[in-house]
């Protein structure tokens, strides 16, 4: 297949639309079901590169959950804990025997479930039965993978009356070294972003604390790979092999750090016993529970706790989750890694990161205020690596 006609471009009025290879060669994909759209393919191709890089860097199966050309979550296939199974709403499944790929998607989807609603999924490995079962129960636009078992295809065929978007990509496809983009009739050309995210990239430790564990190295590389395919400005908080907060597309770096930090905080607050024990009605769906929890742990908690409101969601009225209780729980979050796609211009980013348990930082360096940023890291005993490489993505 040399080209594929699409229903429309970014918006319904943008017609005609298609994807094709400029050199006239065959597309490196097969659409196995559904009719993916323009934005679906943007998510699919960016997501595929991300999980391909994660697999190459870690040796582990990887998954990502994309929305509007940025990852809402991404992870490698480490086993789930009982608590994670609960907050990711998979504790009613045989989660202890999930395949590594299924664990990766459960983590990628579960980190920021509000943002992942209606995601496009990318998988580094052949989609298996376990992963397909997870995908089947979530609201999602589609999935791209290098292959699918027949069991997985049969399961995915049950989504959207057989119209769920399933794309198979050739894992051996290598794009041309130059890429092109057209804006307002003007063609832009640049070399592809083929930077290898490896141990050498994070070897320049500039802080007093230079103790970088193997797990921290892994998480640093994961954060940088995620940023490589996230709309800039971007920062990413990572813990235990998965993104727990991605801040994308903000003009101010500290607002990126705050946004991603709040997402990381929410991920951790969802694990507090007070939240785990919320008395939901049996009729409340997973998506409705996600929405209720998001409000409950935020500042607008009375929107779900006011008389006449809580009865719609809970069997009994929950107690308020006070600021003091939340801070006490957040103080237990430790050993988080923070990556940034460009340098931190001020130390306020580090101050904010500290509140979300950050111990390890990877950023390019190069700010005139690098000394102040390093000093703040030293104040909190953090380990910071200067990569020397910017990772803007647009």
Regions found by a protein language model. Give the residues of each.
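Active-site loops and adjacent core secondary-structure elements that bind or stabilize anionic groups
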Residues: 1-201, 216-234
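Bateman/CBS regulatory modules and CBS-like beta-alpha motifs in cytosolic regions of diverse proteins
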Residues: 126, 205-215, 344
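Flexible, glycine/charged-enriched surface loops at secondary-structure junctions
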Residues: 57-65, 166-169, 232-239, 269-280, ...
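Conserved helix-loop functional segments at active or binding sites
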Residues: 53, 229, 266-270, 355, ...
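C-terminal binding/interaction regions
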Residues: 119, 123-124, 137-167, 172-174, ...
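Glycine- and Gly-Pro-enriched alpha-helical subdomains that act as flexible
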Residues: 72-113, 244-346
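Active-site-proximal loop/turn and secondary-structure-junction residues that shape catalytic pockets
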Residues: 70, 127, 239-242, 344, ...
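Gly-rich Lys/Arg/Thr-decorated short loops/hinges at beta-loop-alpha junctions or inter-strand turns
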Residues: 23-35, 111-117, 191-210, 288-309, ...
């Amino acid at each position: 297949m040399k080209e594929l006609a699409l229903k429309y471009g970014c918006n319904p009025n943008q017609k005609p639309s298609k994807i094709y290879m400029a050199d006239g060669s065959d597309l490196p994909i097969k659409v196995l079901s559904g009719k993916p759209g323009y934005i679906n393919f943007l998510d699919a191709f960016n997501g595929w590169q991300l999980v391909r890089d994660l697999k190459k860097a870690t040796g582990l199966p990887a998954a990502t959950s994309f929305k509007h050309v940025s990852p809402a979550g991404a992870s490698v296939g480490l086993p789930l804990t009982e608590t994670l199974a609960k907050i990711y709403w998979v504790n009613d499944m045989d989660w202890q025997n999930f395949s590594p790929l299924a664990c990766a998607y459960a983590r990628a989807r579960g980190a920021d479930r509000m943002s992942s609603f209606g995601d496009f999924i990318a998988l580094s490995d052949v989609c298996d039965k376990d992963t397909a079962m997870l995908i089947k129960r979530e609201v999602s636009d589609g999935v791209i993978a290098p292959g699918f078992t027949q069991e997985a295809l049969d399961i995915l065929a049950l989504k959207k009356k057989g119209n769920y978007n399933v794309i198979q990509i050739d894992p051996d496809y290598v794009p041309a070294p130059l890429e092109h983009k057209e804006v307002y009739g003007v063609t832009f050309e640049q070399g592809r972003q083929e930077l290898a995210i490896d141990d050498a990239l994070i070897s320049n430790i500039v802080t007093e604390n230079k103790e970088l564990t193997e797990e921290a190295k892994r998480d640093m590389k994961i954060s940088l790979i995620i940023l490589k395919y996230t709309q800039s400005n971007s920062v990413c908080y990572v813990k235990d092999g998965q993104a727990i907060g991605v801040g994308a597309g903000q003009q101010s770096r500290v607002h990126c750090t705050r946004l991603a930090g709040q997402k990381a905080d929410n991920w951790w607050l969802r694990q507090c016993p007070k939240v785990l024990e919320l008395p939901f009605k049996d009729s409340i769906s997973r998506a409705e529970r996600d929405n209720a929890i998001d409000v409950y742990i935020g500042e607008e908690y009375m929107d779900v706790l006011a008389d006449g409101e809580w009865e719609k969601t809970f069997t009994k009225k929950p107690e308020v989750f006070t600021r003091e209780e939340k801070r006490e729980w957040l103080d237990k979050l430790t050993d988080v890694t923070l990556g940034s796609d460009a340098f931190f211009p001020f130390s306020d980013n580090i101050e904010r990161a500290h509140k979300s348990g950050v111990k390890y930082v990877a950023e390019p360096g190069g700010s005139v205020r690098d000394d102040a940023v390093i000093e703040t890291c030293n104040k909190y005993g953090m380990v910071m690596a200067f990569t020397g490489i910017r990772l803007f993505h647009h």
